[in-house]
Amino acid sequence: FSVRESSQLADIHYTRQGDPLGLGHAILRAKSHVGEHSFAVLLGDDIIDARDPLLNRMLEIHQQTGDNVIALLEVPAEQISLYGCASVTATDSDSVIVTDLVEKPAPGTAPSNYAVIGRYVLRQEMFQILEQTAPGRGGEIQLTDALQYAAKHTGIAGGVRGVIFTGRRYDTGDKLDFIKATIKIASDREDIGPDLKEWLKEYTKSL
């Protein structure tokens, strides 16, 4: 692995959330660093393979439409209650118009199987909406609630578009998923993948 000085990669700032008051609250903590610009939110426990240019496509759609853009993944009905869920309308491009969102719907009540995953491109005006968003599910300030408001009041912070992702994604939200993601990513590497796969074959014989 090669290591480079972080100063050569980006201008890095950080802030502490303090109390776990929701994703919307965490994003508000970065307001002073964003200024008057649109910005991207990338959740660290949602890994997208760099060979699948999801964020680049989201940025293109944002630049073309001026809308907020979220990443969507079609999931089985029994899993949708684990995610924010989007109602969508098809367009003539590879993006969809998001008409409504609900945070972790109760089983059997989801409006679709499109789950919101951890990539967002947001307009600066979303900070203003988040500041006015009351605590929702779990007593937290939910980004999903703010995006729902934006989807229904497009004149305030632009509309909301979705990009339906079909590439390689790894959820590392718990210990087992983290281990699975590490093995999958490592086995796909050209330098160590072949040796790792051979070791895995031998190791699993003993299980």
Locate each region found by the language model.
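Short, structured coil/loop segments at alpha-helix boundaries
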Residues: F1, R189-G193, K205
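Short, flexible segments with low predicted structural confidence
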Residues: F1-V3, V98-T99
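Conserved beta-loop-beta/alpha segment of the NTase-like Rossmann-fold superfamily
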Residues: S2-V88, Q124, L130-T133
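Mixed-charge, polar/low-complexity N-terminal
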Residues: Q8-L9, Y14-T15, L21, L28, ...
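Alpha-helix boundary/capping detector
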Residues: R29, D49, N56-R57, K152-H153, ...
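Catalytic-core segments of class I nucleotidyltransferases/pyrophosphorylases
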Residues: A40, L59-Q63, D92-E198
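Intrinsic disorder at enzyme termini
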Residues: L196-W199, Y203-L207
